[in-house]
Amino acid sequence: MTNNKEERLKQLTRMQYEVTQKNGTEPPFQNEYWDLHEDGIYVDIVSGKPLFSSLDKFDAHCGWPSFTKPVDAGEIEEKLDTSHGMIRTEVRSKSADSHLGHVFPDGPGPDGLRYCINSAALRFVPKDDLEKEGYGEYVKLFERKKSGEES
C-alpha cells in the first residue's frame, strides 16, 4: 500500500470515496461484508491500519458489518454527529481520518457497544493471509480462539 494518501484516494471506488471522504453511507444488505463470516481482520481502506476483527463481529440485523469493539482502540476516533436531524456518535479512523460509520449503545458485548461500519471503508484480510500481507501480529488472536475452543 502506497504511503501517499492522495495516491491511495485515487485508487478508491466511487462508493469508497463517498463513504470515507464525504461521510456517506452505503446501502444496507447491499455491501461486501455485512454477511461475511470468515476469520480475519478488517483494515482501513485508505491507511491499511487494522480496525476490527471477525472475532468481534456479530449480526445486528442492520445490513452493515457490526462489531463489539475495535481491534485497536487507538486507531478509532469518535465524534458527535448531528447530521440528518439525529444525534449520533460518528466513528473515524485516526490515521487516515476516514469516515467509517457510527457506534451505538445497543451491542451485545460487555461494553454494550455496536460499531456499525460501512463495508466501503474496510478491506478484509483473511486469517490465512495475515502474515503475507504484513499483519502477522494479529495471527495470535485466532490462535487464542482455537486454543479456547479446544479446552
From Swiss-Prot:
Catalytic activity: L-methionyl-[protein] + [thioredoxin]-disulfide + H2O = L-methionyl-(R)-S-oxide-[protein] + [thioredoxin]-dithiol
UniProt keyword list: Oxidoreductase
InterPro entries: Met_Sox_Rdtase_MsrB (IPR028427), Met_Sox_Rdtase_MsrB_dom (IPR002579), Mss4-like_sf (IPR011057)
Domain MsrB: 5-127
A single Gene Ontology CC term: cytoplasm
Pfam families with a match to the protein in the record: SelR
Active site: 116 (nucleophile)
EC id: 1.8.4.12
GO-annotated biological processes: protein repair; response to oxidative stress
Gene Ontology MF terms: peptide-methionine (R)-S-oxide reductase activity
Record flagged with keyword Magnesium: no
Family: Belongs to the MsrB Met sulfoxide reductase family.
Protein name: Peptide methionine sulfoxide reductase MsrB
The organism of origin for this protein: Bacillus licheniformis (strain ATCC 14580 / DSM 13 / JCM 2505 / CCUG 7422 / NBRC 12200 / NCIMB 9375 / NCTC 10341 / NRRL NRS-1264 / Gibson 46)
Lineage of the organism: Bacteria, Bacillati, Bacillota, Bacilli, Bacillales
Gene: msrB
